Design a protein with these regions (language model features):
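CBM-like, beta-strand-rich accessory domains located in the C-terminal region of large
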Residues: 1-163
Length: 163
């Protein structure tokens, strides 16, 4: 395959880490696909609990050069959901309930913004999933949107199985 346009470097690391007295799997990944246009590198840290009931994530936008736009930079982080997942946004627009077709319930929650980007919002938008035969199927996606400063930003989130 080929990396997306503008991506020159991708870093990836996977390891087992302690988490609440148990082992968890942590993945650190980064790419420079936004460096030439926005002057930012995107890093994502994922930590999956040993029992698979929590996925904690952190998206970090790090200044990579003096290139890129001045002022605040709009961003959108997208989480494409599987077929048949029903989404109900919370009243504060910082969380969502995800009802799976088999009846299991997951919660999604935004954490704090430690990068000074200001208000970040969560919404649900239409999306598509293409099956193995090339047929598209309507799905939904969760979208985190906000403005990052040129100095970067740090945004945490959590998926948790609740039922």
């Amino acid at each position: 395959g080929q990396l997306g346009k503008g991506v020159e470097t991708v870093d990836f690391d996977r390891r087992t880490v302690p988490s609440r007295g148990r082992e968890a799997t942590r993945i650190d990944a980064a790419h420079d696909g936004y460096a030439s246009r926005f002057g930012l590198t995107h890093q994502r840290i994922l930590t999956l609990s040993g029992d698979g009931t929590e996925l904690a994530g952190e998206d970090i936008l790090v200044p990579s050069s003096k290139n890129g736009k001045r002022g605040k930079i709009a961003f959108a982080l997208r989480f494409h959901l599987g077929r048949g997942v029903e989404v109900q946004l919370s009243g504060d627009k910082r969380g969502a309930s995800l009802l799976l077709p088999d009846g299991r319930l997951w919660q999604f929650r935004l954490g704090g913004d430690r990068g000074g980007a200001g208000e970040i919002t969560l919404s649900a938008e239409d999306s598509l999933w293409v099956d193995g035969d090339g047929r598209p199927h309507a799905t939904e996606q969760l979208v985190i949107e906000g403005l990052a400063l040129r100095s970067g930003g740090q945004f945490s989130w959590l998926f948790r199985k609740t039922g």
